[in-house]
């Protein structure tokens, strides 16, 4: 009996030890997280979140020792490969503009102080995102995404509101059809060609073969004829449930799909008397000929004869094949936009969304956070910054929440916050490029800074409301603190902002169109343009700068739409430049 009791006591002791150890580990883990949050210490790995796509091959993350400037791999004692950066010459005989094209992308930047309120699932944010004119990149910053109480400031981070906002943004973006980019080369105009190439081209091979009904057949005229307008062909939407009803070999109305491979290819790459549906020929009364090709046949226009490596692809992707149907269904299921980064620091939240096909052209993504709140380091105030390369152009996006208050000392504190964010924001280089120095904000070619900057209007409460009632925005801007600082060059020297031709965005009564009035606790609050979007860098054009009438919080959201130029590496132009350089070298040697 005594032995049984002793064994039971040992078991209880073991369980107590295990529970105490687990509790101690949990305490240490919680303390570690809180200390990291207090002193704004980043983890060794990137701690931002992003969408994952199993079907997407992220080529930007692949490492190629040759293209990355790293050669002569060595192996350490553990079998790990050590790469040594190779030396690069300082001056190149090949000028950059000889192998670079320019492309314009549309960027929609939005900022909103949501006051710690969680959105409902039916909240309409289409106006804030400007979905009527879809952008290629959406840079959205939220402030006070969680209430700024002691628990959220000093305790564990609550990411549930961020998830709800992301779901709302995702639903809004994926209800629209993204635009196509127009490739325009200023330094290398296209040479005369027999065929007039379309201005809009697909971004990937899969988009080349799967298009919407109004893009299925675009006219390509000869050089002597102008491009005539043609009626679009309605393409039925195929559901997955109807796959069993599809005749793989085609119906009686589609005789081409029943032809042998050789005869089918001859039809596709010749000029038949009776054209196939996918390659139609129209001859009008004026004997003007117009050829209409689908994107599948346009690939063949680059060669005088059908390329052998594409013959099987044409046959397998013709109408009625399983491959074309499955490809269509797969692309219809994929979202139009994907989230490439989301980062939260207490109440400051920055999320960036891009077109799905633009994702592979984004690289060197890095995140930096700077807390300037309590004790100058806590993240209740501060910035979340993202650095990335879009094609070959470095961009920097910042979401900030600066110190509040209407006193003169509060304005100086905001100025100090901006200088501190500039000083402490650093984007560490990739581990393989250890010789490079950390990149600061000003080391980027295009910069967009948005957020609740909290700058006020230096007028009395009564005078401010009087100018607002008369909509005299220009006179009101003369007393805006941020506009004055930028004009004097004390802050954001060389930066730009759109015209403030809308009412101040702060401070409103909740779910109301009225500015907040007399408050026994806080007194009179003067309206102000607290929510701002400014930018720096050449090659950026502002389309619109406006506020949106969403009454969720005491702030109104603000949107700015830009057209930004990016540099795109042109392999054809690079090969041409290298050929000329090689010829010059051979001439000097001779």
From Swiss-Prot:
Region (Catalytic 2): 523-538
GO biological process: abscisic acid-activated signaling pathway; inositol trisphosphate metabolic process; phosphatidylinositol dephosphorylation; seed germination; seedling development
Gene3D superfamilies reported in the protein's UniProt record: Endonuclease/exonuclease/phosphatase (3.60.10.10)
Gene Ontology molecular-function annotations: inositol trisphosphate phosphatase activity; inositol-1,3,4,5-tetrakisphosphate 5-phosphatase activity; inositol-1,4,5-trisphosphate 5-phosphatase activity; inositol-polyphosphate 5-phosphatase activity; phosphatidylinositol-3,4,5-trisphosphate 5-phosphatase activity; phosphatidylinositol-4,5-bisphosphate 5-phosphatase activity
Summary of the tissues where the protein is detected: Expressed ubiquitously.
Keywords associated with the record: Abscisic acid signaling pathway, Hydrolase, Phosphoprotein
Effect of a null allele: No visible phenotype. Slightly reduced production of reactive oxygen species (ROS). Alterations in germination and in early seedling growth. Enhanced sensibility to abscisic acid (ABA) with elevated levels of Ins(1,4,5)P3.
Reactions this protein catalyses: 1D-myo-inositol 1,4,5-trisphosphate + H2O = 1D-myo-inositol 1,4-bisphosphate + phosphate; 1D-myo-inositol 1,3,4,5-tetrakisphosphate + H2O = 1D-myo-inositol 1,3,4-trisphosphate + phosphate
Phosphoserine modifications at: 60
Skewed-composition ranges (Acidic residues): 48-57
Region (Catalytic 1): 445-460
Keyword Hydrolase in record: yes
Highest taxon in the source lineage: Eukaryota
Region listing for Disordered, in residue ranges: 47-73
Pfam families recorded: Exo_endo_phos2 (PF22669)
Induction description: Induced by ABA at both transcript and protein levels in a specific, transient manner.
EC numbers for this chain: 3.1.3.56
Entry's family note: Belongs to the inositol polyphosphate 5-phosphatase family.
Chain's role: Has phosphatase activity toward Ins(1,4,5)P3 and Ins(1,3,4,5)P4, but not toward Ins(1,4)P2, Ins(1)P. Seems to be involved in the abscisic acid (ABA) signaling pathway. Could also be able to hydrolyze PtdIns(4,5)P2 and PtdIns(3,4,5)P3.
Protein name per its UniProtKB record: Type I inositol polyphosphate 5-phosphatase 1
The species this protein was found in: Arabidopsis thaliana (Mouse-ear cress)
Gene this protein is translated from: IP5P1
